[in-house]
Amino acid sequence: MSSETLSQELRGAPVAKAITEKLAAQVQELRAQGVTPKLVIVRIGQKSDDLTYERAAYTRAEKVGFEVETIELPEDATQEQVNVTFDQVSADALVHGCLPMRPFPAGIDEHEALQHLAPEKDVDCATDSMLLATLCGTPGALGPCTAEAVLALLDFYQVPLEGAPVAVVGRSNVIGRPVAALLSARNATVTVCHSKTKDLTATLKQAEVVVVAAGRAHLIGADYVRAGQTIIDVGINWDEAAQKLVGDVNTEQVAPLVSAYTPVPGGVGSVTTAILARHVVAAAQRTLA
């Protein structure tokens, strides 16, 4: 890429705004039919990351027009308390979606607890059944909000996916695997990379789109990319030395070399609550079907 060519910064705010405006109209239609979409957030303790995302969810809900309630359990909550909480949320006909703030504290068996959440109210792909539906490409499956935010961002900026070689760095059930499945469903040719991948540099350079969700600050630098690529950075890491949030991509190194990239913060993360809202509205719409 010549020094005269500027790479495009793919910001999340315009994507979230477009989704929010569309959802607000859908919520008005639901309210006219006597349905007010409602999300319940289940949070154990007061981790700062959880509280930050919770505030963002409330802000998005206000813009879209649906209700949110938080059930806060103490840090030392028992397994039984957590299980019963999900039972109650599942049984409440006025609740359409539930967002469990994960990971749970060490003393809680997350898998056991989430078996008590009704899959139709799972709006962030926390349950095994919703994850399976996402990985299998089942119509109507609600994938992890962050994974779907990646697709929403690529669509908004009209990044071609059909037939395109795409590399995903990371294979977690929260982002890596689901985003690979979503991309594959769009007929991209997907390679999933991880810590055991041989010659990661060569693999990534062959891709037209690279999605990085490894959870390691500045893992991907200039050596891993080439001109013409679109780089999607899903990572959110705290850089203690710089005292700021950074991604899994070293943006200073990578941005001048590629065609397009997402910033951190301000990229994928800012679309995630809009996808959460979309899922809550979709769950509410299904109650009328």
Pin down the residues of each PLM region.
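N-terminal glycine-rich anion-binding loops that anchor highly charged ligand groups
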Residues: 29-39, 45-63
